[in-house]
Amino acid sequence: NEITDILREIERVSKLHNVFISGSAHEYTAPWNKQRAEELARKLAGALVHEECRITSGFGLGLGSAIINGALDIIYNEKYRHIDEHLCLRPFPQNIPDPDERAKRWKEYRESIIDETGISIFLFGNKYDAATESTVVADGCIQEFEIAKAKGNLIIPIGSTGYAAKVIS
């Protein structure tokens, strides 16, 4: 039993260098705009890689490219290592016509992504809802928060970015 506890603690501590960045941004509200949001995502990713973290991202709308660019800037300019040591991209599978099957697949996918990490950071978290023709809190980000919380991840919402991140904070 003590050995099992020790192994669990080792696993927990080793995952603290694996950081999941959750977020999407269809829209930006003051004081945020597209440029500032991308700069935040880029600088955050770069700082994490600089500190020897491995970033996992689902390539969220409006933020994914900035996360990649921030990580790659440091990998190429400072680390001279394989990209996989610092960056893991997990874009969500698309073109699943059955909404129930898509929801099930995405939940399983989120669980597998978050299971590999020890810290979850939440930025923005909004999406366009065609039914209401408005921008709403991204339910996927909320689901990722619930999964991360259940798995015991350290949760870091950047509430000032609004939407899901604000709800989580």
Regions of interest found by a model, annotated:
Residues 9-18, 44-48:
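Glycine-rich phosphate/diphosphate-binding loops that line cofactor/substrate pockets in enzymes
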